[in-house]
């Protein structure tokens, strides 16, 4: 039997770089919220212990794909602790709607969905804490998708405090370019010393993203989309880009602006949600 699992997008409602560690990783403060929009992962169990991704990504080797890496990591961790039923395997496919290099967390969300779904389907019985710890080895954003609640994140993104920001409507626009995260984080002009503040203080301030100035400077497409969106609503970059978003109080307001978008702008309208669609599907 084939089952389907949501793999939602996220937005960084704000993102501040507070420092850089000796190992090169940047410390930050950010606010994650999910969208009721994303990829869909389909899983069909097999009994020969194999993992197969039926929808490969061009340019990414099968074993390097985060989906396959997540499945194999869960398989090894559960097996090492005697919690993997004999023969556990899976055929996995993905209906991909989220762009790569868009700042929407697509790859991290895919990995988290696979960890949560296979833990359930294989009946491994690992806790969310264990899954989140595994997820962190795959990527800094994976734990928030595993835990499934909007969160204030610190450290390199792994220290999570659940929060409930307003669930607004968003017009999310993709400028048509992909921005690899290292391009932003290695830029010498990236702000790296924004003062740390409490979540209470940050929620009262106007939200912004320290990466935005670099993305706008280096990618004229990002600058063009933001310039257009800012004529209609508060707008900013998510993550390290390339996607940008404008926030609205109602769906109709967001859709009216999308209808006026220039032909070169690709976008969608989605609602911000504090409970991940993945976890909502499991209730």
Swiss-Prot record:
Active site per database record: 10, 141
Leading EC class: transferase
Organism domain of life: Bacteria
SUPFAM superfamilies, alphabetized: GHMP Kinase, C-terminal domain (SSF55060), Ribosomal protein S5 domain 2-like (SSF54211)
Chain segments annotated as transmembrane: none
GO molecular function, one term: ATP binding
Keyword ATP-binding: yes
Biological function: Catalyzes the phosphorylation of the position 2 hydroxy group of 4-diphosphocytidyl-2C-methyl-D-erythritol.
Name of the protein described by the UniProt record: 4-diphosphocytidyl-2-C-methyl-D-erythritol kinase
Origin organism lineage: Bacteria, Pseudomonadati, Pseudomonadota, Gammaproteobacteria, Enterobacterales
Gene from which the chain derives: ispE
